[in-house]
Amino acid sequence: MSEFTDYEKKKLLKHFSNTDKSVFAIITPRQVDRGALMSRYSRTDKSMRKIFLDEFLKNKNRGEEFYTRVLLEYGDDSVAELGGGQIAIEGLSNIAVKKIEDRRIGFSYLEKSSRYVSWDKKINGAYKFCREHDIMKSSFADLYVNACNLDFDVYTKNIQPMLKLIRENDSIENYNFKDKSGKNKKFPDLIDKNDIKSEQRIYNAATKAKALDALRSLLPASTLTNVGITGNGRAFEYLLSIMFGSGLSEERELASQIKNELDTTIKSFVRRSNDKYGQVLQKYLNDIKKNSVKLSKLYVSGKPTKGSFVKLVSYEKEKDAINNVISALIYEQSPSIEFSYIQKNIKRIPRTEKIKIINQYAKIRKNRRHRPPRAFEMTDYTFDLLTNYGMFRDFHRHRALTLERQLLTTDHDYHTPNEIVELGIEKEFSECMENSKNVFEKIRRKLPEQAQYVVNFAYNYPYFMKLNLREATHLIELRTVPQGHTDYRRIAQKMYRLIEKKHPILSKILKYVDMTEYELERFESEKRTEEKRKKT
């Protein structure tokens, strides 16, 4: 006999994907009800659909009431992870978007790309960069706007010349394409009109990406971007508390806007972000910042390094790392033996046998998506990095690691892409950089955080990353794929060499690191995309 009457089934089908199976999707429209249902689920022997009929169907405010009681009265934060929201933010600066993307857990992001989309278009006669509130009401307003306008002017007027240079240096005639019969042919040998159009599309996309890659170095951190965010309620609440407590007016204003929009979908989950509890958290975070500033003034001395570098500053002896990795590799399948005893057993294995074990696990990886087992999380590395800010933005997307960064400044000099020199605009490029530096130094004296907005992507930026070998494998293999930006490919390759030097045995697990240099990085990727498009 069915658990539900026909009338109940009819009602339930508006909120669940089925009424008679043990696996079902929760499709009730309100996120707060979805989360509350799952949370109630853990404290009753009723089925979820029965809970819905008994408690939620007749009371439209049941979910809100539940969260108000659980979150405010009991402080059970984990229940806020059971509901989520999706928001889009358009027209925020690269300073603000990085602050948002600093949050690692509970979020997924997708940001507007600087290699596929150009920033040359104006809105109402103005380039798309943030007119930061505190700067614009200061005596630096004109200097700031003029510096950003200069960056965009040079960027805009050189898009077509850069595209022309890249296409002259790397002609479409040099490349092989698949025709409709599946044969590889040089472009001049293609006959079919559709094949010709298809291959021109591939080439145009790849060359445009390379041109924009080179020119993005000119863009200032004030450049406006768009980002889509999916996250759970708890993550959003923490993000909002951080942004409400920010020293930057743009970030505080964004916090208000995000909160207003989330109140329409997951209000119960973000209620505390700026109430008395949220403000206590904001004070705590600002106290941490103040303490760090004091300690820095007390104990840190030296001059900023010029140029870029990658240093491996912390790692363990490979002998110890191998023992821990192998112990973890066999732990799950071991016959009820505790980890410390397994470690003792592994230490007695001859080194040659240990090398064979690591090589075995490397051998069974057939592509880079075959992640190494979790055992390879047992050893980690700390890298000290100084790379251009544009490149940092790509590495910043990796979240299964510890990344700390400093304020964006002009202290570390800047990187000039080879294509800028080849195009003959190095002088103009340098003038942009020097102008930004001069304006930055003036703003910095009174508004050090706000001064970041005028700094170009080309300027070198300091940060460190601590990551385990499993995550290092993912990051380095992904960031050395042929279609990757030259800047981050080279940094990832250097990271690999440093790991290989210190851990020659364990580094064998990094099987899919591409050390080759490519002229037109996006070409093969665009070819694969076009071939898939043809099949659909």
Spans of model-derived segments:
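A conserved ligand/cofactor-binding region detector
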Residues: M1-T536
